[in-house]
């Protein structure tokens, strides 16, 4: 995980759901994202197979995560959120999926 957080990065170091790191606003964004609907690499769900190397997230969760990161401010925490946003959405770019009910 990233310094100052318990939820940002691969896995988490939190002892429970309410356990947040020093950058609590940023950590809250990551915690919510970690609990989003997803399809793990190599898994199939909703008739979709994730053939990528990384977990594929629900598109609504990705949009919410991106906005949450944008809403984090402060000289250190804001820069950390900006860095995560640029790395995650700029380099990671695994795509996302939408679930729609049949009409």
From Swiss-Prot:
Family, as annotated: Belongs to the phospholipase A2 family. Group III subfamily.
Cofactor descriptive note: Binds 1 Ca(2+) ion.
UniProt organism field: Chersonesometrus fulvipes
EC number: 3.1.1.4
Catalysis: reaction(s): a 1,2-diacyl-sn-glycero-3-phosphocholine + H2O = a 1-acyl-sn-glycero-3-phosphocholine + a fatty acid + H(+)
PROSITE patterns: PA2_HIS (PS00118)
Cell compartment(s), UniProt: Secreted
Protein name, entry field: Phospholipase A2 large subunit
Enzyme class: hydrolase
Alphabetized UniProt keyword annotations: Calcium, Calcium channel impairing toxin, Disulfide bond, Glycoprotein, Hydrolase, Ion channel impairing toxin, Lipid degradation, Lipid metabolism, Metal-binding, Neurotoxin, Ryanodine-sensitive calcium-release channel impairing toxin, Secreted, Toxin, Zymogen
Classification lineage: Eukaryota, Metazoa, Ecdysozoa, Arthropoda, Chelicerata
Active site, UniProt feature: 33
Family matches, as SUPFAM superfamilies: Phospholipase A2, PLA2
List of residues binding Ca(2+): 7, 9, 11, 34
């Amino acid at each position: 995980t990233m310094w100052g957080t318990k939820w940002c990065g691969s896995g988490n170091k939190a002892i429970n759901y309410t356990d947040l790191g020093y950058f609590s606003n940023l950590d809250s964004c990551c915690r919510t994202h970690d609990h989003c609907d997803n399809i793990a690499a190599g898994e199939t769900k909703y008739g979709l197979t994730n053939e990528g190397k990384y977990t594929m997230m629900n598109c609504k969760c990705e949009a919410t995560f991106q906005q949450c990161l944008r809403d984090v401010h402060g000289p250190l925490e804001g820069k950390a959120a900006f860095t995560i946003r640029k790395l995650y959405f700029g380099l990671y770019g695994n795509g996302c999926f939408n679930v729609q009910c049949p009409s």
